């Protein structure tokens, strides 16, 4: 009991240290935690999530190639046009555009490019930017749990498919429930005071001359290679969804399966990157310098350290976890969503949280191919791994706060009371609630 107490202290200390260091420090601190747990507290090292890391690397490589060819900018340009064309609907369009950008790209960092546009359009309509900004940032995080190419979804489909929930079925649950949750949250936020000219912070900045009027940006010309790179990438995503569905046990269009789903995603994405490099004539040596590549490789290190730390602790206490979790979650299914929510707050990654906890939960609930009565709990609760918005240190949150020159999107005085907390909790709560309605019907 005493040993377990010290192990939990080391686990929590490593997570808090990682959050404090930020960036790559999240992964570094995870490695430090593994070192202390194994060498000083006698635990056996857990499994390193190489499959998740490889998928992230492959997807990020393809997106980075598309970014280098101008395809990512073209995608953002399309999003900008939509936002500027219907400015009065910014509260619904900002989260919608952010959501579908993330669904397609598999990373929430695409929202960075939208932030200045959201601020401009909101300001021109006398709407506080904090509402559409917070909705867009949170939507980009929860969309990771519905993106066909995100590491989290790929991992979950891989572990749940042998239990009878194939790739396409899971997407049929996660995409509509998470998107509808984003729209319902936008509707609820519409009842708050959204008038920009009623915000004292904004009026003070306006009086001091710190705020310039919204500027309409001139439309850039898009090269053929930018458009081509986007279509190649979209083709790759569609091919992955089709292939993963075709090799699933329920559909079984391709049999025998020579290339498994994880390997297929890696090879498809690397092939997409190759085609972009060839046909869009980009310099492959420069891809590593792109912002997407850097943030993606940072994510790999974070997943490496944090997921390894989580698996080291969990795998050494699997019997105790099984004993308590089996009856608690079976009797109170929502507790899994709460546990995933709290874990993702600290682990800072949907994929890392899923990798660290879901295998243990499956074992604890006794789920197998022959016993799937509790499978819906895991599928419905998955969206709750999106609580990256709780601590205001995530890059997209900080970017939204920094780029909102109106001053309406603020850091909380008491850390947690920031602009993203309420919409974030609402989106996750509604996603999970809708999941508990839809999952039993679809599975």
Curated annotation (Swiss-Prot):
Disulfide bonds: none annotated. It is a multi-pass membrane protein. Keywords: Cell inner membrane, Cell membrane, Membrane, Transmembrane, Transmembrane helix, Transport. It holds the Pfam family DcuA_DcuB. One of its GO terms (cellular component) is plasma membrane. Belongs to the DcuA/DcuB transporter (TC 2.A.13.1) family. Responsible for the transport of C4-dicarboxylates. The chain crosses the membrane at residues 21-41, 46-66, 99-119, 142-162, 171-191, 228-248, 264-284, 295-315, 327-347, 375-395, 419-439. The keyword DNA damage does not apply. This is C4-dicarboxylate transporter DcuA. It is found in: Cell inner membrane. The keyword Nucleotide-binding does not apply. GO terms for molecular function: C4-dicarboxylate transmembrane transporter activity. It comes from Helicobacter pylori (strain J99 / ATCC 700824) (Campylobacter pylori J99).
């Amino acid at each position: 009991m005493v040993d377990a107490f010290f192990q939990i202290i080391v686990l929590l200390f490593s997570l808090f240290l990682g959050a404090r260091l930020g960036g790559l420090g999240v992964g570094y601190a995870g490695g430090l935690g593994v070192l202390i747990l194994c060498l000083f507290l006698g635990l056996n090292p857990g499994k390193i999530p190489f499959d998740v890391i490889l998928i992230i690397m492959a997807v990020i490589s393809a997106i980075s190639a598309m970014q280098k060819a101008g395809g990512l900018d073209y995608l953002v340009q399309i999003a900008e046009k939509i936002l500027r064309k219907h400015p009065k609907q910014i509260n619904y369009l900002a989260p919608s555009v952010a959501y579908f950008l993330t669904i397609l790209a598999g990373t929430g960092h695409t929202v960075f490019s939208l932030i200045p546009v959201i601020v401009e359009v909101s300001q021109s309509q006398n709407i506080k930017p904090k509402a559409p900004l917070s909705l867009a940032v949170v939507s980009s995080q929860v969309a990771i749990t519905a993106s066909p190419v995100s590491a989290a979804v790929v991992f979950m489909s891989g572990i749940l498919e042998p239990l009878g929930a194939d790739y396409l079925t899971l997407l049929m649950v996660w995409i509509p429930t998470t998107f509808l949750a984003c729209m319902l949250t936008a509707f609820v936020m519409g009842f708050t005071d959204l008038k920009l000219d009623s915000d004292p912070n904004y009026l003070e900045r306006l009086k001091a001359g710190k705020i310039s009027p919204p500027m309409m940006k001139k439309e850039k010309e898009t090269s053929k290679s930018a458009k081509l790179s986007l279509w190649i990438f979209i083709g790759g995503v569609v091919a992955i969804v089709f292939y993963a569905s075709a090799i699933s046990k329920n559909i079984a269009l391709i049999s025998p399966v020579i290339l498994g789903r994880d390997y297929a995603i890696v090879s498809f994405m690397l092939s997409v990157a190759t085609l972009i490099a060839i046909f869009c004539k980009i310099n492959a040596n420069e891809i590593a310098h792109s912002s997407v590549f850097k943030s993606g490789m940072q994510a790999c290190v974070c997943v490496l350290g944090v997921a390894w730390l989580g698996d080291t602790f969990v795998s050494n206490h699997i019997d105790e976890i099984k004993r308590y979790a089996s009856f608690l979650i079976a009797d109170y299914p929502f507790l899994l969503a709460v546990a995933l929510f709290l874990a993702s707050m600290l682990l800072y990654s949907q994929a890392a949280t899923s990798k660290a906890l879901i295998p243990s939960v499956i074992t604890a609930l006794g789920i197998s191919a022959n016993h799937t009565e509790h499978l819906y709990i895991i599928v419905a609760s998955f969206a709750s791994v999106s609580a990256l918005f709780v601590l205001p240190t995530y890059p997209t949150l900080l970017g939204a706060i920094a780029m909102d020159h109106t001053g309406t999107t603020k850091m909380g005085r008491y850390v947690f009371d920031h602009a993203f907390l309420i919409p974030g909790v609402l989106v996750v709560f509604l996603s999970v609630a809708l999941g508990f309605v839809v999952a039993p019907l679809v599975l």
